[in-house]
Amino acid sequence: MRVNITLACTETGDRNYISTKNKRTNPERIELKKYSPRLKKHTLHRETK
């Protein structure tokens, strides 16, 4: 079952990205390095509700 998730920057708190994930294969929260437009660099983004 795929669900929509929001990825928020850990440094600014901005919610920059929306993605989907499979809850059966990835039950834990996702952490990805993505580009933050406000900081103009790549930062860690975590899954939020």
UniProtKB/Swiss-Prot annotation:
Instruction: State the encoding gene.
Output: rpmG2
Reading the lineage from the top rank, the first entry is Bacteria
A Pfam family cross-referenced in the UniProt record is: Ribosomal_L33
Q: Which GO terms describe its cellular component?
A: cytoplasm; ribonucleoprotein complex; ribosome
Gene3D superfamilies linked: Ribosomal protein L33
Which organism does this record belong to? Oceanobacillus iheyensis (strain DSM 14371 / CIP 107618 / JCM 11309 / KCTC 3954 / HTE831)
Q: Name one GO biological process term.
A: translation
Q: Which InterPro entries match?
A: Ribosomal_bL33, Ribosomal_bL33_CS, Ribosomal_bL33_sf, Ribosomal_zn-bd
The Swiss-Prot or TrEMBL record describes its family as follows: Belongs to the bacterial ribosomal protein bL33 family.
What protein is this chain from?
Answer: Large ribosomal subunit protein bL33B
- Return one GO MF term: structural constituent of ribosome
Keyword terms of this UniProt record:
Ribonucleoprotein, Ribosomal protein
Residue span of the signal peptide, if any? Answer: none
